[in-house]
């Protein structure tokens, strides 16, 4: 079962909700859970010395506990394998102007061609929700390797 970071941020800000959903997937036969730990903003859902931690999403505050560690602990108690997933080449949410390409690293953003504006930073293309990173940017590659 895949647990998306943004869609479940408020829900998983509470340990009892994590308990409920892990117990539920176990009861219907799942053996593995995949926890999204780096949504498209580039923030992470655990404490990191390399990436900013997502502590709020759409008004909901993160719980006062290590989200990822709790998923691992509870999942293992239930006999579930816990895996993580993260967005590697995305570091901004264009609908909310939020993320690393908006708060300090606009040079990391990829460029896109639009028929009406020509070549522009993807952060200016509001019909695309994810601000993709230029994979050739050496500074970003060093950053994401540290995050991994």
Language model segments and positions:
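Hydrophobic faces of well-ordered beta-strands that scaffold small-molecule active sites
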Residues: 1-3, 33-35, 82-84
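Active-site-adjacent "subsite" loops/lids of carbohydrate-active enzymes
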Residues: 1-15, 89-147
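Catalytic domains of carbohydrate-active enzymes, especially glycoside hydrolases
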Residues: 16-43
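Aromatic/hydrophobic pocket-lining residues that form the small-molecule binding cavity
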Residues: 18, 64, 68, 141-144
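Short, well-ordered coil/turn segments that N-cap beta-strands
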Residues: 29-31, 76-82
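Glycine-rich, proline-tolerant flexible connector loops at the mouths of alpha/beta enzymes
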Residues: 37-60
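A short acidic, glycine-rich active-site loop
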Residues: 55-64, 110-112
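Anion (oxyanion) recognition and catalysis
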Residues: 69-72, 76
């Amino acid at each position: 079962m895949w647990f998306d970071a943004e869609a479940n941020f408020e829900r998983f800000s509470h340990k009892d909700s994590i308990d409920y959903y892990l117990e539920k997937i176990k009861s219907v036969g799942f053996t593995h859970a995949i926890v999204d730990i780096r949504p498209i903003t580039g923030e992470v859902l655990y404490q990191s010395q390399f990436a900013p931690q997502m502590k709020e999403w759409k008004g909901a505050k993160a719980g006062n506990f290590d989200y990822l560690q709790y998923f691992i602990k509870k999942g293992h108690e239930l006999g579930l394998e816990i895996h993580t997933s993260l967005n590697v080449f995305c570091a901004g949410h264009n609908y909310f102007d939020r993320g690393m390409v908006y708060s300090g690293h606009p040079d990391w953003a990829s460029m896109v061609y639009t028929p009406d504006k020509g070549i522009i930073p993807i952060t200016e293309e509001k019909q695309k929700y994810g601000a993709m990173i230029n994979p050739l940017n050496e500074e970003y590659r060093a950053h994401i390797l540290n995050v991994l």
